[in-house]
Amino acid sequence: MKKKPTINNLKELKASGYSTLSVKDELSKNLSELIKTGKPTFPNIYGYENTVIPDLERAILSKHNINFLGLRGQAKTRLARMIINLLDEWIPVIKGSEINDDPLNPISSYGKNIIAENGDNTQIEWMHKSDRFYEKLATPDVTVSDLIGDVDPIKAASLKLSYADERVIHFGMIPRANRCIFVINELPDLQARIQVSLFSILEEKEIQIRGFKLRIPLDLQFIFTANPEDYTNRGSIVTPLKDRIGSQIITHYPHTLSIAKKITSQESDVKASNIYLSLIHI
């Protein structure tokens, strides 16, 4: 792991020549460089070398939001988690920002006000790529407040602010994942009205809370997972949301017994000498 940079304020950051990339640009650039080295892009994922992984590489290079569609145990979530390895090691954020504001391009009122007050003396901190992964399991009880946020009426009253003012919002998981990868597992389980709330974020990069529209250009890489069996058992993905997901990647079970045995060997935790894994010797 690269050492954490020692730059502590905006002046030093500007002097270093640092330039900002969006999350999708980061992933695309780093994947392109990795492919050129000839190293495996997603190591220890067996059976997908000529199917899923090339599709995933194309989706990342195309800067698409991604949906993994497949049955249980097909490494959908594992692949999603491995994508963080393609992020830059460290990125700067404005110290104290709830939504990981970029010091060179803040999007929240907090970030803009801090820079207006402190200028080049604005304090920054560094965020490691391992902290840039957010994951939410879609369940029927998930609400818009959980994902996007809600108006805090107490804060609005105490500060005498309009409900349309960004400062009265309690941000949900998605805004807090700004400049990160956000994974929603089992997307069909998410209620249709909750899926609808994602439209403007995916397309216009706006968030809408209780009818108030705020132009906050969030920078996110969305990854979804879905099981086709869930379409009949519990729910479905609404069509307009499908249209906003750039790439749908179909996963599958191993095509050969040798690959299946290799995966079983990798996933088994056989430590005691008296345990015999007969499948490997079939």
What is the predicted role of each segment?
Residues 201, 273-277:
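A short, hydrophobic/aromatic-rich structural module that often spans a beta strand
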